[in-house]
Amino acid sequence: MFKFKASDLPEILTRWSARYSVFVPSGSPDNAQMRIWSRRTRKEVRFMEPDEYTNLIVAPKGFVFGEREELFRWEGNEKTCTAISAPSSSSLQEEDKILFGLRPCDTYGLAYMDRFFLGEHHDINYHLRRQHVFIVAVNCLEAGPECYCASMGTGPFAEITAHTEYGMQAGKGYDLLLTPDYGPDHKKGEKGENDWYWVEAGSDRGKALLSHVAPLLYRDLEFTGRRRKKALQEDALKTFRRTLDTSTVRQVLAAHFKGEEWDAIASSCIACTGCTRVC
């Protein structure tokens, strides 16, 4: 298994930025947002280390899903309606981009969107954006106060399951997966001499990303990496303050499917799509 020194992470991001648009978490612990990283902006962007934030304040859905966009046009009258243009991706000009620092819960969500929008209900615009997005996820060593991903099987570590269209072995949705392994002298937000990242490729695209930074990688025994990762995951599971019993979720939701609370929520809807944008 490969690993690299935490102190080399800025250089890795910079090397990637020579080929891709690289987005990294920036801001404050309670307001982490994606900002672009490059040799030019490196000193302007306050890059947040993975132990400085729990998750982004807004999900990264906007990188693959347009807030508003034209799907088709039609013409007609009271009796007939005829489509005069089909969905087209010709108007979307996308460039390859890397989203660094996504958490396992969001990568699982991305994999679910892949399964839907790239499956039977194929969405051309989603497809175009998705094929240009590379995901570098980072496992969580500590749960946030409101986190319950362990109960849902979507964290704190991403696991390898089924394949998606882009070769990702994902119920996870990542191309690369990093696991922080901090030394005993580690200080939050800093890079100590004994701080490392274990790195695993989840797709051929992920392997290509690694090839661009090969001189900065160290190879360790697969057994050593797996054993260390398992220990870190067990420690992370102990940090959860919330749990959720999912055994009866289906029955509870079905029983309240026509509940009055949904009517109350619907009455305030102004069709801004904000809820689906951030979820």
Question: Where are the regions that the model predicts?
Answer:
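Cysteine-centered iron-sulfur cluster-binding motifs in ferredoxin-type domains/subunits
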Residues: 262-278
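Iron-sulfur-associated redox domains of electron-transfer enzymes in respiratory
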Residues: 1-252
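Long, contiguous internal "core" modules enriched in hydrophobic/ aromatic residues
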Residues: 253-263
